[in-house]
Amino acid sequence: MITSKPKKRYAFIDVQNTASTTRKLLGFLIDWHKLYSYLTLKWKCEKVFFYSGIDEGDDETAKEFESLKGAGCIVKTRTVFSYKKPDKTISIKCIACGKENVEVVSMGYNHKSNCDVDLTVDAVEEAGPDKEFLIFTGDGDFDYLIKKIVEKGTKVYVVSSNAGIKKPGLNTKRLSTRLKEVMKQHEQGKIDLINIDSWKMKIQKEV
């Protein structure tokens, strides 16, 4: 009787996206050491990759990820840089006098670290029919990556949340529509969603 070898399981964690999902949407912070333990003990992950931007001078976060590296994680960090979003011009017409007033509104800054590139390169290099990947992100920019690694025979679990935020003037889902489309396009069992909500009691940070 021929038995198939168990597949190697790796985790790739988009730290910013995952942390934002649990904090803003689900109301809890992740203890990254607990998550690492859960992935290695419960899910039998042989490799766990963390990708994170770190603000210049943020020694506390830098030390935390050094500690994860010491525990056995593969940690890749980049310095966060900021760039200004284009200002928005609003034109308001006075009903009484008919005069048009133009106001320039600052839209603030975006913060990027370009860790997506590192995650993409590592995942493509590691992919193969003998692997299963847990990819922690809800970011639609990873739709093409997921297609490619599935084509290489790798089973993919997308770890995020399908929950949404509903407020007056705001109705948004954390899991990108593009990722949902990728899941629909593939046969059942090739790409599955794991709702990180269900892991809360195992991975949340005590505050």
Name each model-derived stretch.
Residues 74-207:
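Nuclease catalytic cores that cleave nucleic-acid phosphodiester bonds
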Residues 1-107, 150-151, 155, 161-165:
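Domain-level signal for Mg2+-assisted phosphodiester chemistry and nucleotide/NA-binding surfaces
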